[in-house]
Amino acid sequence: MASVISRAVRFHDDLEKEKLQEGEESHMEMRAYEMSSEYKHGKDAINKPSSNGRGLSRVFSEDYDAGEILVFDPRGPRINLWNKIFLAACLISLFVDPLFFYLPVAKKEKCIDMSIGLEVSLTIIRTFVDAFYIIHIYIRFQTAYIAPSSRVSGRGELIIDSSKIASNYMKKELWSDLVAALPLPQVLIWAVIPNIKGSEMIASRHVVRLVSIFQYLLRLYLIYPLSSKITKASGVMMEKAWAGAAYYLTLYMLASHVLGSTWYLLSIERQDECWKKACTLQYPHCQYHYLDCQSLSDPNRNAWLKSSNLSGLCDQNSHFFQFGIFDDAVTLEITSSNFLTKYYYCLWWGLRNLSSSGENLLTSTHVAEINFAVIVAILGLVLFALLIGNMQTYLQSTTIRLEEWRIRRTDTERWMHHRQLPHYLKENVRRHDQFRWVATRGVDEEAILRDLPVDLRRDIKRHLCLNLVRQVPLFDQMDDRMLDAICERLKPTLCTPGTCIVREGDPVDEMLFIVRGRLDSCTTNGGRTGFFNTCRIGSGDFCGEELLPWALDPRPTAVLPSSTRTVRAITEVEAFALIAEDLKFVAAQFRRLHSKQLRQTFRFYSHQWRTWAACFIQAAWFRYKRMKETNEVKEKENLMMMSNVKYYGNDDSQYFSAPLQVPKGSSYSMYSGKLVGSLRRGRSMRYGSELDMLGTLRKPIEPDFNDDGD
């Protein structure tokens, strides 16, 4: 907005400024400052009125703070939460309104009365539910709407001007919401009906029924746009599969509840028609207002009731009147039962006939009764199909991956049978598929991460892999940017027990960072006889470090390095793999990896360097032992020669004059010579072969650190 306002500000040149007076100049500068500061930020433009008295009327949803203004974003979380709350209130209202049909009660005195206790309870509940409709109207006056002209580009601009919001709402949806919020049943049963007497009492019941049905249909209609708003905001009506199935089952039960209450009201009407027909035969002794319980104190009514045969004429066994599908209400005296009894029976009647599409309904020739049976049959077909279809959709969403895994496993079994794989290979394949399903439940993590934005994908990878990568001492010394680059390129890997990760001598194409499980790493130094080195690696360890010198080489080659060890899984293993090309990319992009500070860390934690260091120390120790034992043999030889001189000498002068001379050909001289030779040959044979074997062990290739900038 600042750029738009800047076009309206006139910039004067130096000549014009000289002509201006000092007061006018300062006034213009202050004016320009006020205009630029007014539209400096979107939030300021909303909170502060403009200089010409007009406020900002439209804005994008991300350009204002919803906590500082009293206009709600229709796509925001608050409106979405309120829509869900209001939807629950609407469902409660749809459940409460049919209960007004249970107000008429057939008394034993052959009259129809209203249940006062039920009237009070329903009035309280209905008034509480109506309050949500009033609150909804108020919220709609405070909710912005999207400008129709801006929908062609992106999400559109929000109209936040209160007058425009009110005008738009009053033109479209206010009147339907207002009629739906009116407490019409309460007004009728408490203010209108008690003031009606005589023959108009019977007609008033029809008015209550028609008004209730009209408002009920209107509230039922308002649920569909409300559900569509929730679906647009969150993508689905219910996030959980069981919640979606329960939602449609609730709607089906609600339809059964409505049909049952309607059937009860029509049963009351049919029974009243039977009484009217009998009353017509006894005219003028019988009047229609006698059928209302307000006339119980009338002595003429009591005299007529004693003389009439009303009970026999309106009995279910009489052929005077056909009750048709309402025969159960008369036979079981449902119309004169208490509320819980008649409610549950009517609910069962509605559910039974809705599920069977009205197959068991035996109607009479009454037109209204036949129409009601037709409506029951049609609603039963439609609603039952919708219930089964939606519940199947929601329930299948929980097992669809399991079915996909079963189909894939069946295809695998057919392929293995077609290729005639041996039994042990089949078992390995089955074990791998089972372990993969248990570990992932058929979810492709890589596909999920690929669909996410780059920053969110980086954060998730960092959360999953950073602690694991930091457990590797070689990578713990790297900076955060390098660790993020490594984490982004790690891919999950699963291994079953007995899986050979890499064999000695095979090209190494990836590094593995172990998350869970144990592996066995061994080497024979290229298959040399008598050489074997083994170790165990587990959680937090890594293997495939032969790739590091290859990745750090400033003159890379296309030939991958050969593995110096055989790595095999002992238990079920979960790991992250870093392939050779990704490691090469990280090494090329981040020069920190070439730091000389990593040299000792790399040597200490590398199994290849550890093996070479152990062999180097053993070779040095063997050389030291051979030199030490050679010196000991020489000392023993000198002592033996000294003892020979002492043995053959006769006097002291001879003993000291030739201390190292031994008569040749003597038996002791020959024995001592053989003994010394055998000792030398034994020591040489013992350490010679080991030194030869260890001496031929090649030193691992060391990373090139010549290009670092330290």
Curated annotation (Swiss-Prot):
Main subcellular location: nucleus
Top-level division of the source organism's lineage: Eukaryota
Tissue expr: Expressed in roots, stems, leaves, flowers and pods.
Membrane topology (UniProt): Multi-pass membrane protein
Cross-referenced SUPFAM superfamilies: cAMP-binding domain-like, Voltage-gated potassium channels
Metal-binding found in the keyword field: no
Protein's name according to its UniProt entry: Protein CNGC15a
